[in-house]
Amino acid sequence: MTIGFDGKRLYDNKTGLGNYSRTLFNRLLQFYPEEEYKIFVHQKYFEDSQYKYPAFVDRTIVSDAFSADLWRFKGVEEDIAQHGINVFHGLSNEVPELPSGIKKVVTIHDVIFHKLPKTFPFIDRQMYSYKTKKACHIADAVIAVSEQTKQDLIELTKTPEEKIHVVYPTWNKEYEHECNYVLKEEYFARYGLPRDFVLYVGAVSKRKNFLRLLEAMNLPENQDKHLVAVSNGGDEYGAAEEYIYDKQLEGRVFFLKDLPWYELPIIYHMSQGLVYPSLYEGFGLPILEALRCGKPVITSNLSSMPEVGGDACIFIDPTNVEEISAAINFIYYNLELAAEIKTKAMHQIQKFNPQKMTQKMMDVYRSL
């Protein structure tokens, strides 16, 4: 069987959608090397990519069509047909119309535009709604990254339940490496980080609720604590900078921008734990990553986050600053928590075992 993939996010996206694409592709190569894989991408996204690994490049078809957007919408069909693809997988909420002999799979990561409409301009909401509904309609199989996303899709698109398969994302191989004292010391020095800190990973945006996390850090009981945010900015980054300046938090809040993806597991290991008070997630990969590192996680009691965290997380009302603050205090000073969390985390992450999740994905491909 020859399986094709949309390579835009794989080559061009540094965050969640890109990580999902790269991890899935690498795991398929690891567990199912007997199958053939092809990545289709426009040179606009390929040319300056930092992800030109031999395993990807050797299996990539690069288009030099005049318009990258038009090629992804229509021109890619011809390229896919020419390369003997049996199944084509759109990895991020879109899939092209293809000849009937080529089966189509699409991964839908979330429907944020539907659940939190005020965080999107009207035109964007209409476009995302159209693309999502169309992708679910023309695909032979729809991959939802969580049960929550599956239910959201049924509500929004009326897609038959039997057409939607829940296949959880998993962690990449970097999370399986040990992180010893010497390595941690190297990274404390490299980035000038405080010796103890809680970690945030994600955009500085309204949906991610970062400003409330800053408010929690500014409460009197947290004046001795530090926050490290691994983030490349977002729609509230300016407001966050202003708040940090006004409240004189510069010495306690640190941003790590453009952190190489392979260094992130080390930062998790260095932290006291993850604080992830998002208002909505289709999945919430940082929760899984932190649990894989055996770290305490504070996250929201909304959408998919309880599904991912199970009984291994501390759940809070993300709109309650005092609740966020109390949870930070708890993981900072409760030394007995570490061993308990590690035990629960190791149990919870088995739900997302890489081999099991990759097998579920391959089962979908082979069923078509």
Please report, for each region that a protein language model flagged, where it lies by residue.
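Carbohydrate transferase catalytic cores enriched for Leloir-type hexosyltransferases
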Residues: 1-368
